[in-house]
Amino acid sequence: MTTLACRKLAPHPESPRHQHAGPWLVWLHGLLGSRQDWLPVAQLCGDYPSLLIDLPGHGQSVSLSADGFADISRQLSQTLQANGIREYWLAGYSLGGRIAMYHACYGRHHGLQGLLVEGGNLGLENAELRQARLQQDRQWAQRFRQEPLPQVLDDWYQQAVFADLDPQQREQLVLLRADNHGPAVAEMLEATSLGHQPWLLPALQRLNVPYTYLCGDRDHKFLQLAQQYQLPLHTLARAGHNAHRANPGAFAAQVLAFLSQSSCLPPSSLSR
């Protein structure tokens, strides 16, 4: 059994859930991140117990590898089992959002109560696009393996999806992410390339648990994606692609509102 490194947060002592084992919030970070990225939001959602997970190749799971989405979904299921988590809400950002969607659609997700996705890509609709993305991700992976990490990160955060960042914010992210292990990041990047990811929209539309799609109001790429495919979109003010980092208070408020609303819905209802 492969289990991912993780950290548990108990509910606040004054929370009505403190003495009762209710559904957990399980948090999946993005590429180059770690479980620490979710800590401010998880603490603001302190009425619920949280499990913050380090994905393979990241944080304290840096020595772990994964052979694609199905393998990571299995590792997630085994981690939940090892921690005694039977009912849970799954939240993920960017890469973590893609893994969360895959797990909800195709994984062993017994006990899943709902899905929260922040800026996660649904996949690519045809083989030509997938092949082009595989080639692009292989080029990035080669750089992560061979070049000094700060140099690669400088270019990584110049990508269009990070256009809302100012120079100071980019510099802060480069410094924050420079403690990653380049070859481990490269392996995870290749294993979870959009070129390997299935097109998730049809399966998402068949989900029998509530789900929501969160997006910063400056994240034009993913706003357009959510609107194009009529995802259950909620936006966050003054935020780009990494909305939970830019505006953790508003993000936590959206999470809590979704949980409160969804807990009142019949099991087959979708929060749309």
Curated annotation (Swiss-Prot):
InterPro entries: AB_hydrolase_1, AB_hydrolase_fold, SHCHC_synthase_MenH. This is 2-succinyl-6-hydroxy-2,4-cyclohexadiene-1-carboxylate synthase. It catalyses: 5-enolpyruvoyl-6-hydroxy-2-succinyl-cyclohex-3-ene-1-carboxylate = (1R,6R)-6-hydroxy-2-succinyl-cyclohexa-2,4-diene-1-carboxylate + pyruvate. Catalyzes a proton abstraction reaction that results in 2,5-elimination of pyruvate from 2-succinyl-5-enolpyruvyl-6-hydroxy-3-cyclohexene-1-carboxylate (SEPHCHC) and the formation of 2-succinyl-6-hydroxy-2,4-cyclohexadiene-1-carboxylate (SHCHC). Belongs to the AB hydrolase superfamily. MenH family. One of its GO terms (molecular function) is 2-succinyl-6-hydroxy-2,4-cyclohexadiene-1-carboxylate synthase activity. One of its GO terms (biological process) is menaquinone biosynthetic process. Its EC number is 4.2.99.20. Monomer. Pathway: Quinol/quinone metabolism; 1,4-dihydroxy-2-naphthoate biosynthesis; 1,4-dihydroxy-2-naphthoate from chorismate: step 3/7; Quinol/quinone metabolism; menaquinone biosynthesis. Keywords: Lyase, Menaquinone biosynthesis. The keyword Disulfide bond does not apply. The keyword Lyase applies.
